[in-house]
Amino acid sequence: DAQVIGINNRDLHTLTVDLDTTKKLAVKIPEDRIVISESGISSHDDVENLSPYADGFLVGSHLVASDNLALALRELIFGTHKVCGLKTLEAAQAAYDCGAYYGGLIFVEASPRYIAPEAAKELMAVPLNFVGVFQNASLEFVLATAEDLSLKAIQLHGEESHDYIERLREK
């Protein structure tokens, strides 16, 4: 008569994890019960795939292993969405508040969404993972901007050569 039923995806003898365990067993549980899928959930895709079978998820080790619990939880719930073209602190905060994981900063002067690296420093107060968008910029500019702003990723939108990309990767 339990109202909440947990389905452990971990085999306690071998410690292997099989997320299909939830799919196989959930169909045997009465529909008026709350089903919790336990163990092995580590991505938004896992949550999406198991949502038709479970009402909730027990996630522990994936979150505990994260350096940033808030971002790890955000990624698990919303996935890794990027809102690009952020130019103001208010816009960056709104993107974060709405579930964004990445914030895109466009360092292409010809773009109407351009932000100068100096102005972008203010946006770093928002706990997003920031991505710098560059187009045919010098390697030195890209590297200096990435370092100054602690960018999590670099996105190239120009005609950068394979050699340019390889040199960028080496840094």
Segments from the language model and where they lie:
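Catalytic cores of alpha/beta
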Residues: 1, 22, 37-59, 64, ...
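N-terminal active-site wall of soluble small-molecule enzyme domains
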Residues: 1, 22-25, 105-168
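Glycine/small-residue-rich hydrophobic helix-like segments
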Residues: 2-40
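Structural preference for beta-strand elements that scaffold enzyme active sites
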Residues: 3-6, 34-36, 56-58, 80-82, ...
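Glycine-rich phosphate-binding active-site loops on the catalytic face of alpha/beta enzymes
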Residues: 7-15, 41, 53-73, 100-113, ...
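C-terminal helical cap(s) of enzyme catalytic domains, especially alpha/beta-barrels
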Residues: 19, 24-28, 51, 63-81, ...
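N-terminal hydrophobic targeting segments
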Residues: 73-131
